Amino acid sequence: MNLSTFFMGMSVGFSLILAIGAQNAFVLKQGLKQQFVFIVCLICALSDALLITGGVFGFGKLISQFPLIISIAKYAGALFLIVYGARSFIAAYQSNQSLVAQGEDVGNLKQVIALCLAFTWLNPHVYLDTVILLGTIASQVTDKLAFALGAILSSFIFFFSLGYGARVLQPLFAKPLSWKILDI
């Protein structure tokens, strides 16, 4: 395995995942509330692994031949994010919530899994960034497996660090204003 290609995949993976979007905010919230953190991080990382593998090993070509796939994902994702964003904005405006020691109940495991899958698979940028952009960059390297493994490892490191590292931020989120900012 070519280590420079592995680290290239890792650095590209980190650069694409670091922006705090709806999915990362959801992982952060679950980590702050310490509810279903492992399963949320695992779903996000495994989903990324599937998308990275598809992008690196040819799914990007399939999408470029059938752009309707992206259009459907884009519009379904936009609708989901608009509805969820509106709900979060309303909750931020109406709420004075702060983090309590045991965390606020966010629903049962099935609800959390459904939300996590929606944030992951209905996000239009995931296809553009993870599949097409990563796939395009990977097409320029000879050791695609090393590149893919590096990018996949970056996802696992990032999601589990975000989910479990969130507890460090709990004192900050004891203030209702912090939750309002995160919700918005």
Map each language-model feature to its residues.
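Juxtamembrane transmembrane-helix termini in multi-pass membrane transport proteins
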Residues: 3-71, 131-146
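Selective transmembrane alpha-helices of multi-pass membrane proteins
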Residues: 5, 65-97, 152-162, 170, ...
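Small-residue packing motifs within transmembrane alpha-helices
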Residues: 5-9, 39, 73-74, 81, ...
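Alpha-helical transmembrane segments and their lipid-water interface positions
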Residues: 47-59, 81-85, 127, 158-166
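Flexible interhelical linker loops that connect adjacent transmembrane helices
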Residues: 94-113
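Selected transmembrane alpha-helices and immediately adjacent juxtamembrane segments
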Residues: 109-130
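Short alpha-helical packing/oligomerization segments
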Residues: 141-157
